[in-house]
């Protein structure tokens, strides 16, 4: 009934078997799942196809083989890859975190793409916060420690926004929240984008899926500042060494050193580009006031739209090692649900929605921080992301992504 809303957790399923010419039977699971906060009259009637494979293997069909069959069945071969630069957007994992995707998956994909004439490379942008991935040298070293290098990954590894996070393209978008997203140059200059995402919880966005991988991960350091903050950067005077690097590199002449040799920002000139935050090596130039989870997710959707604008794109997500928090941490807590499988789609919105629905429907693992925080609750069918991070609102991001035409939340789940 399209005139009524269905509450969170109301899942309607229909199991069918479609026989295609020359193909084995394919089980089709259609899920119509909407949130009571959504006006259903605004939702397009068409559904995107999301393809799924479980993690069961045989000696003649390992997970790499199954992932390859999955993406071929999902239609990746319809893209013309010949002589095209293909950015495989991935998270290399912060050293110490062991939940990130194994490089074997990237290597097999890169080899397949090259067989189709593509020029693939793995890429990610530098981080805004301090850590082992805040500049390209440390970032590449971290990637190498986690198994990502041109030999193991079978393709080049490129940090998209350069040595210090200052190499980016402003993509004209005129979005409701982001007018010209700052996208890492290597990602912006790529001809085709493929996201390969470890689906997990996230302490600010609710969960980290394809949109988060692209929209946040593909933003330059200054872009990440725009995503996280609703105000201009500020100077922590006690940390400032008076090195003058922010003064030299401010494109708007908005920073000077005062009589105490401390940096000061002229907010009448500051445009909030975040380059001072990217360049400062002493944690003196820092972010201003952080945005709400809703606004963060709105901006992530618009940044994703900028990255994918006018480009062929394809998306793969792994519901494995679903840790409660992001792979940006230097540790990973125990998984909150059992491993479920791998999904693929041309629609990143439908893909994220399908992944979220599957995690919500799954049982929680006893002994995880989720069951320890909610020991007396029935967690199968519960919104595990909201339970883990109650101040987040992941639904808002998907609804905004659908609103701006990035994809649709309704989908048909096809098991391969």
Region annotations inferred by a language model:
Residues 46-97, 101-105, 116-124, 129-416:
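Extended, low-polarity segments enriched in aliphatic/aromatic residues
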Residues 12, 27-29, 350:
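N-terminal non-cleavable signal-anchor helices
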Residues 26-31, 43:
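Short hydrophobic transmembrane-like helices used for membrane targeting/insertion
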Residues 107, 112:
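Active-site cofactor/substrate anionic-group-binding motifs, chiefly glycine-
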Residues 1-15:
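Single conserved hydrophobic/aromatic residue that forms the stacking wall/gate
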Residues 33-35:
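Aromatic (phenylalanine/tyrosine) cluster motif
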């Amino acid at each position: 009934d399209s005139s009524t809303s269905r509450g969170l957790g109301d899942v309607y399923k229909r199991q069918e078997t479609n026989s295609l010419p020359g193909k084995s039977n394919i089980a089709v699971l259609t899920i119509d799942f909407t949130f009571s906060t959504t006006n259903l009259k605004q939702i397009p009637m068409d559904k995107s196809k999301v393809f799924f494979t479980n993690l069961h293997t045989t000696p003649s069909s390992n997970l790499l083989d199954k992932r390859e069959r999955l993406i071929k069945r999902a239609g990746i071969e319809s893209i013309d890859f010949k002589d095209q630069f293909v950015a495989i957007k991935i998270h290399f994992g912060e050293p110490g975190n062991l939940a990130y995707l194994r490089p074997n998956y990237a290597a097999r994909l890169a080899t397949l793409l090259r067989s189709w004439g593509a020029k693939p490379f793995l890429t990610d942008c530098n981080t805004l916060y301090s850590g082992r991935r805040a500049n390209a040298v440390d970032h590449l070293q971290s990637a190498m420690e986690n198994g990502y290098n041109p030999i193991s990954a079978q393709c080049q590894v490129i940090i998209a926004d350069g040595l210090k996070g200052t190499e980016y393209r402003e993509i004209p978008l005129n979005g409701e929240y982001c007018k010209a997203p700052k996208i890492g140059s290597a990602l912006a200059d790529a001809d085709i984008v493929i996201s390969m995402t470890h689906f997990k919880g996230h302490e600010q966005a609710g969960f980290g899926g394809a949109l988060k991988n692209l929209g946040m991960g593909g933003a330059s350091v200054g872009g990440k500042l725009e995503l996280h903050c609703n105000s201009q950067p500020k100077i922590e005077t006690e940390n400032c060494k008076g090195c003058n690097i922010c003064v030299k590199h401010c494109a708007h002449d908005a920073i000077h050193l005062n009589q105490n040799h401390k940096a000061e920002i002229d907010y009448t000139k500051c445009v909030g580009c975040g380059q001072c935050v990217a360049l400062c090596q002493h944690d003196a130039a820092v972010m201003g006031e952080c945005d709400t989870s809703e606004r963060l997710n709105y901006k992530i959707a618009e940044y994703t739209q900028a990255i994918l604008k006018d480009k062929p794109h394809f998306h793969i997500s792994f519901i494995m090692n679903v840790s409660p928090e992001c792979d940006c941490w230097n540790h990973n807590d125990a998984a909150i649900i059992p491993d479920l499988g791998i999904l693929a789609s041309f629609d990143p919105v439908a893909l994220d929605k399908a992944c979220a629905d599957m995690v919500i429907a799954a049982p929680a693992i006893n002994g995880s921080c989720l069951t320890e925080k909610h020991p007396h609750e029935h967690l199968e069918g519960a919104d595990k992301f909201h339970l883990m991070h109650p101040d987040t609102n992941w639904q808002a991001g998907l609804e905004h992504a659908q609103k701006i035409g990035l994809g649709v939340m309704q989908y048909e789940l096809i098991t391969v």
